[in-house]
Regions:
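Recognition helix of helix-turn-helix/homeodomain-like DNA-binding domains
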Residues: 26-39
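Short, conserved catalytic or interaction motifs in soluble domains
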Residues: 36, 55, 65
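Key DNA-contact positions within bacterial/archaeal DNA-binding proteins
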Residues: 18, 29, 58
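DNA major-groove recognition helix of helix-turn-helix/homeodomain DNA-binding modules
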Residues: 44-59
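Short, charged recognition helix plus adjacent turn
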Residues: 62-69
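Short basic helix-loop element that most often maps to the first helix and adjoining turn
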Residues: 4-23
């Protein structure tokens, strides 16, 4: 799964990973893992991230071809 969280963080005033983590009540390490594609967030966390970044879940996360198999 491809993530666009980093792009949206910078479009929303260059939020740091820690600032975003604080906004959604998770650790910075969780944000790092999501951005690197090492961790898929729960539906609830994905919705919260989208709300805080003023976008949609679909804009934050994209399935890649390999994810369809």
């Amino acid at each position: 799964m491809k993530t666009n969280i980093r792009r949206f963080r910078f479009e929303r005033g260059e939020l740091s990973q820690q600032q975003l983590a604080d906004m959604v009540s998770v650790s910075r390490q969780t944000i790092v893992a999501i951005e690197r594609g090492n961790y898929s967030p729960s539906v609830k966390l994905a919705l919260i991230l989208a709300r805080k970044l003023e976008t949609t879940v679909e804009a934050l996360f994209e399935l890649e071809e390999k994810d369809h198999d």
